[in-house]
Swiss-Prot record:
This is Maintenance of mitochondrial morphology protein 1. The gene is mmm1. The lineage of its organism: Eukaryota, Fungi, Dikarya, Ascomycota, Pezizomycotina. Residues 1-22 are lumenal. The SMP-LTD domain is a barrel-like domain that can bind various types of glycerophospholipids in its interior and mediate their transfer between two adjacent bilayers. One of its GO terms (molecular function) is lipid binding.
Length: 494
């Protein structure tokens, strides 16, 4: 008898087969899922982290691929196929990489509007970027100035490196000092106590025919208020007619910088840039090449220096100037809308003295203003060579301290300098009352105008400091004030 399709004997066999297939498929799927999880999540490589700051920038600020970013296979095959000569080892720098707009785009500075030049004038392109406060720059500048002041005070007794000797030699230059002025003696120098404050820094682009795409220039406001930045001198006016030294008029001056404010302009001058044009009546500003060979300063109008071309300074022997490799320079200047407030005090005469003559103050202020404008006020600039920043063992130093000693266990070079150490102990050992240097006193007592505690003598109408009061009490002042050939005693101040 044949079995029917609905026979119960065949149902357990079919159900067991379907159960086995389902079980095997389930186990296989679990194994595949575990294998995929282990491969891609445990042993897989983590994606590279995004560059900091790039995720928050717009698509227009993305860095463009460099022309040198070729694949390693192409670079390797090209280096094997091509054998460049020695002169072609260094790849040329494309003009697009040094363009002003390219630099601003790659440094994520805001774009500048296009303003064409009119009537051949240089057009300034102002940027919409927010100005910077320069707080960090003020700290660095303050530390540098403080170190210069401390170094100048520590070298005050040096016969060659003293700031007093340097100023005395500069003021008594025979090529610049007139014949009717006797030797100038520096009686008081104060390097100040405050520091300049820089703020509101912004980058602008200036049209320059010597560079592709113009020239970038940094503008920053500077302000300095310091009553202790002063210098006091003494000299004598000589009357050489009808005979030499027929009359002598003692003069004492003190100049203090009350306040200075202006806009500082800083720009880079590449080595390939031709020398800057200067007016015919003043020499061109020295570059890094001429600063080492010739020590002449620009704009010495009073000294009678003739204009020289940039880089054509000859040595004293009359030979050709030393040829050095061109270097990049930094040019800085101030805009004409600066403010320089000076305080000039004067004493004229030996016995009967004229104090704070207004005409003398006007002449001194005008001369200082002219000296400043001839050197660092637009269109004149000061050009300073950039230092060599390549790391060298001769300039390598090791900081003192436990952290530095434990971090580096290697042998130290014999030329390594110990930064700090003895200099720091000497600074703590001596605590100067003020950064003030006094020169040798001449036949007359010094004119101490930097000190704000001087008293006014009503009887004689002159200024007398504490040191002068002590000399008067000793009875030696009358002998010291007697100068042969001075004006007679009958002359009284008008």
């Amino acid at each position: 008898m044949s079995s029917q399709p609905g026979d119960p004997a065949t149902l357990p066999a079919q159900s067991s087969l379907s159960f086995t297939q389902g079980f095997l498929l389930g186990q296989l799927s679990v194994v595949l899922v575990l294998a995929a999880f282990i491969k891609f999540f445990i042993f897989g490589e983590a994606p590279p982290p995004p560059s900091r700051g790039l995720s928050h920038r717009s698509a227009t600020h993305r860095r463009s691929n460099s022309i040198y970013s070729n694949s390693p296979q192409e670079a390797g095959s090209r280096s094997l196929r091509e054998k460049p000569s020695t002169s072609n080892v260094l790849r040329p720098v494309p003009s697009s990489s040094t363009n002003t707009r390219s630099i601003l785009r790659k440094t994520y500075y805001s774009a500048i509007p296009t303003n064409p030049a009119k009537h051949g004038r240089l057009r300034i392109h102002h940027s919409s970027h927010q100005p910077e406060s320069l707080d960090w720059f003020n700290v660095l500048i303050a530390q540098t100035i403080a170190q210069y002041r401390q170094t100048a005070y520590s070298l005050k007794d040096s016969p060659t490196s003293s700031i007093l000797n340097s100023l005395t030699a500069a003021l008594n230059n025979p090529e610049k000092k007139p014949a009717f002025i006797d030797k100038i003696t520096v009686t008081d120098i104060s390097l100040g106590e405050e520091f300049p404050i820089f703020s509101n820094c912004r980058i602008i682009a200036v049209d320059d025919p010597n560079s592709d795409g113009g020239r970038l220039q940094a503008l920053m406001d500077v302000d300095l208020s310091d009553d202790n930045l002063s210098i006091a001198i003494e000299t004598q006016l000589l009357l050489n007619y009808p005979k030499p030294c027929s009359a002598i008029l003692p003069v004492a001056l003190s100049i203090s910088v009350v306040r200075f404010s202006g806009t500082l302009c800083i720009s880079l001058v590449p080595a390939s840039t031709p020398p800057l044009d200067t007016p015919s009546h003043s020499p061109s500003p020295p570059t890094a090449d001429t600063a080492t060979s010739g020590r002449s300063k620009p704009g010495d109008k009073a000294g009678g220096n003739q204009p020289r071309s940039n880089g054509s300074t000859e040595d004293p022997a009359g030979g050709n100037p030393p040829k050095t490799s061109p270097k990049s320079n930094v040019a800085f200047s101030f805009l004409p809308d600066y403010r320089l407030d000076l305080s000039v005090r004067s004493l004229i005469g030996s016995r009967s003295r004229l104090q704070d003559v207004p005409k003398v103050a006007q002449l001194v202020e005008a001369r200082v203003q002219a000296w400043f404008e001839e050197r660092v006020v637009e269109p004149r600039v000061q050009v300073v060579g950039l230092p060599d920043l390549w790391p060298r063992m001769g300039r390598t130093g090791v900081r003192t301290g436990d952290d530095a000693e434990t971090a580096s266990n290697g042998p130290r070079s014999t030329v390594s300098a110990d930064i700090g150490g003895s200099a720091r102990h000497e600074e703590l050992a001596r605590e100067p009352e003020a950064l003030r240097f006094r020169g040798l006193l001449g036949a007359r007592p010094p004119f101490d105008v930097a000190s704000r505690t001087s008293s006014f003598n009503v009887e004689t109408g002159d200024l007398r400091s504490r040191s002068m009061t002590r000399q008067e009490s000793s009875g030696d002042l009358s002998d010291q004030l007697h100068i042969p050939g001075s004006l007679p005693e009958a002359v009284t101040p008008g």
